[in-house]
Amino acid sequence: MNRLKSFSLVIVIFLFSSLVFAGGHSKGMYIHIINFNITGIDRSQYEAAAMKLTSVFAAVPGLKRKHWLANEENNTYGGVYIFDSKESHDAFTESELYAGVKGNPSFTNFSGKSFENIDSLAKHTRGTE
């Protein structure tokens, strides 16, 4: 068996045994990523309005970090929200704050996706705290 196949087999066995012996997946951090296009405002207006909300986001229970995203060339903006638990993530995505972001008339083509962090892998790449 060549080295790549051997390595792949070891990885598959490790992942399977981790799931079996750990009782499933990790219950650690949850991540929510949103994207949208802005309409009727430019980037500087968006940033000025967002600056007024930074303290509101900083006060969200369980929110460890929020990264603000911008790709001005493609008119795509958004955020990466990192939560300490699924519960805090769920509370945020069901909150009035999130509904306000999602329903903002200056944001079109809104999409939001949720992910759990794979802590068993992330701990090796500075993806956990």
Ranges and model annotations:
Residues 1-9:
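Bacterial N-terminal signal peptides that target proteins for export
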Residues 97:
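Short, polar loop motifs at secondary-structure junctions
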Residues 5, 15-77, 86-94, 110-129:
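Short S/T/G/P-rich N-terminal loop/turn motif that feeds into the first structured element of a domain
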Residues 80:
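Beta-strand acidic-aromatic groove motif in beta-rich domains, primarily in extracellular
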Residues 100-108:
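C-terminal structural segments of small proteins and small subunits
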